Every structure is written in C-alpha cells, then in structure tokens.
C-alpha cells in the first residue's frame, strides 16, 4: 500500500506552537510545553507536525500512556508517520522489541525511503538482531549510497562489544570528511564511550588530541561543545571544561550542561549550588528513578515496632526470590552494625517473604509492580528512605553485596559513620568487586548459603576510573565481568547520611550531590555464584529488568556459556584471593584509613 507524505508544515499556527514549545523545553518547563503541544494538536488534529511535537513532549515527561492515546486518535495522519512516532515512543520507554516492529511497519510502507530504512537498522541493532542488521547495512549501501551507512557500522561494532574497532572506524570516518559536523560529533561520542566503558588508552590519547585541536570552526556548534565538555570531564581536564562551558549561554539548561555546572559548583566547594541545580533538574527533567512513588505501590507486611530513625544505621534493599542468600546477608550486616533492615519484596515465590517476616529487626514492604518501571526498584527505595531515614545513616546494598573498607574487621560500620559525621561527610563511595570460585558450589540442603566470603574468594583487581559530572563523580569499569565486554559501571555509593537530600538516580551507581568521604569502600559482589548461568537465563526469561540490563545479562550468558560456567578456565592474570580487607587495600580497591580515623577510633 502506498502512502502520501510530506514534511512541510501545514500552517503557521503549528509552526509557532512548535517554536514556543521548543523554547520552553530548553528552559526545562516541560509540563507547560506539553500543555501547549496538546492544545496545538487539538486545534489541528490533521497536522503531522503538531502530532509529532505533542508525542515528543509526552515522551520527554515519560508519559507514554498519553503518547499512546494520542497516536490512537491520529486517524487522519499518514500511517507510516504514526508508526514512526509509535516507534519513537517505544524507544523512549526502552522497549526495543516493539520499537523494531513499528519501524518495520513504517519502512515497509515506504520502501524507497532511506531514512526509514536507516532507523529500522538501528532498531535491529538495539534489539540484538545483529546478523540481520549487518545484511541490511550492506543492502542499504547499495540502494542508498548517501545514507551514511558508516554510522550504522559503528553502531554495530559497539553492539558487538568491539568498541576499540568502532573508535578506529570513527577516526577513519572523520578523516574522510573532517569538516562534516556529524562525523566530528560521532568521534567525540565514540572516544567518550571507550573511555568510560574500557578506560581505553587509545581513546584517552585521541581525546586529548581532539581537545588540544579545538578551533573556532568546532566551537560554533553547541552540541559539539557539549560533547567536548563531556570528554574533557572524563579525562580530568577541568580547566578545559571551564573554558568550554563559558562559550555556552549562561541560561542554557540542556541537561548535560546543568549537570556540568553542578559538578563545577562541587569542585568549587559550593555544595548548596550543586544541590540547587539538581533540585531544579529533579523538578523539571526528572530521571525515571525520581518519579513519585504511588501510595498503592508499597504495602507494609511486617508487624514489628518501627521507632524514629534517631542515629540508627538502616539498610534498604529489594529482593525477588533470594531466599538462599538472606540468612548470610542479614547476618553479615548485623555483625557490621546495621540496626534495622527495610526490604522491598517484589513478588517472591521461594519463601523469601516468610523468612523475612520472622526477623525481629526487619521491616517488609510488598511491591507487586514492575521492577523495571520502578527504575530497578530505585523508585521504591527512594520513597522508603524519604520516609524512614530523615536522620541517622542509610545503607543501600543489593543482597549479593558485602560492604568492605580498610580494617572494617576492627571498626565496623559505626566506626565509619562516626568518622564521617565528625568530618561532615555525606557519602561513602567505591566500586563492586566481582567474586568467584574455581569450582562449582550449590546451596546446602537447608536452601541457604552460609558463607559466600569463604566459598567465593577470588577476584580480579584490574579496574579503571574516569571522572563523571554525577556524584560520586567517577565511573569505574573492571573485574571479571569486564571480560564479557559490556563495560558496566561498577561505581556504587552504598552509605549515605540521612536527611541530606540524597536521592538514588541509577541504583546507587549515581546519586544527587553530597560530600564524598575520603574513606573509599568496596562491595564484594557475589553475582557469579551458585548456578549463575541458570539464574541469568531465568532472569532474561522473566524479563522484569529494564531493557539495557536484560541485554547485559544476555551478554553474560553468551560469554560464560563459552566456558561452560567454569570460571577456572578464564582466570585472568589479575586474579588474587580475598582473605580480609587488606587484600583489597593491597590492590588499591579501598583507600587507607586517614590518620585521624585511627586516632578518633582509639
């Protein structure tokens, strides 16, 4: 079936409304922009531009239901365009499977349009259909030589975890046409990707080269300036960041620019200004984890007395079918000094809920909703922390994580919190350290694993860090899972002071601003334990995680299946055996305790 289509604006009134909403969005007035866009489409329901603007505003606010309703009513708009906007909405929601179906529908309706084919191939890459994408890239190059297939080949290399090759391809593409802005932007993005996900020395050298050669021709493009700022942050060139950000209008409110201004305020010691900027971002351009938690989302199940927070150390976490870990987990943190536990149980069916309800120091909240829609449970935990930790200390760890810092065996958590309180520190940060065994282990007959630390004693000590504009201000990659090539951020901020406006933005990988302690911590990470391959397969099959997490688990399965789950076959040279916190200290994975920490403790 053939569809007629045009990108021409159909009236001046729609053009004015689109201009107004664009200006408002640049000031982060997203709600008002949405109202204007909806009014414009209501006036002209046959106007494709008005529909597009309204859907884009809905997606910016993550109001996907309203976007869907709008598209259902757009019966007088070209079907291929509606399909494209449906795909854009699925993409904004992170639903790559349905995005792909909608892109296919739009492209099949207009087989002669190279731009729609381009978007379809990108959707295939996002959905993991890499072989199909590779074949279609070749066909696209033949049918549409000007379609910039080199961009798709770089996307494909990244999806195959071949980021170094993608950087080389980006360099080649840039050198072919150095005056082309999109090639320059892509080179900046790829250098940043390699820096963050791999700590790649070649990417670092290229980043410095790019920054050293910035000229007037590059500085006139705001997006290139913003990308250059991100690269400069990653390689620690603060003065370059300051020089570049001064080139942008002072009232620029693009998200990355605001985050950078908050980072610079932190660097200048102005925590109040950093927090003010992040409050503004949270009010106008919130991350999914910052949405309001509905009253119906959490239902308290325990009957234990819940006193005021006082100076308690309170632990918060989410569980789903983790019975075999719970006894060890709760025991470990009780010994460290946790006073009270807050568990969100996300529909466990293995007895986890019953076991938790038997514990006198545990409070249990049931969440029957989607873990993914709650931003990996972060929405729930932010709500509980707001309600139950207005003072004292909050510890956010997963049930496969064991907190460690230098000499923790002698000081416990209370020794750390007392030091942090005396110093005015809000946060303790560090990284996950993947632990594993050289032989398979299964839980004992009573269904509990009682000692992860001794059963899974090995770890890889190779890690790389780059700077970040989001607290705790660094991005960490490394550990044995890095061999799978996914480049996961291992940074964690497990300990925070209550009542200090700390919000979790991406689990505890990123948080809102606070004073980060000079005591660096680590989390022993027991993910590669038990029959972890079966756990990963079940996790993917249940599909309760956000899309990028599901893809990461798929990458783990593909990599570790190569070795049959036998980690002794991998054994990188950087492996050591954990015996105490000293094992991490020797490799720089935790920091030495400051002298006045010891003096105070004594």
What are these language model-derived features?
Residues 377, 405-602:
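Catalytic-site signature of metal-activated, phosphate-bearing donor transferases
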Residues 15, 49, 81-84, 115, ...:
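Start-of-helix register in tetratricopeptide repeats
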Residues 279, 283-327:
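N-proximal low-complexity "stem/linker" segments adjacent to membrane-targeting elements
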Residues 353-396, 404-409:
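Active-site-proximal specificity loops/subdomain of glycosyltransferases
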Residues 26, 60, 92, 126, ...:
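Register position in tetratricopeptide repeats
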Residues 45, 77-79, 111, 144-145, ...:
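Short coil turns that delineate tetratricopeptide repeat
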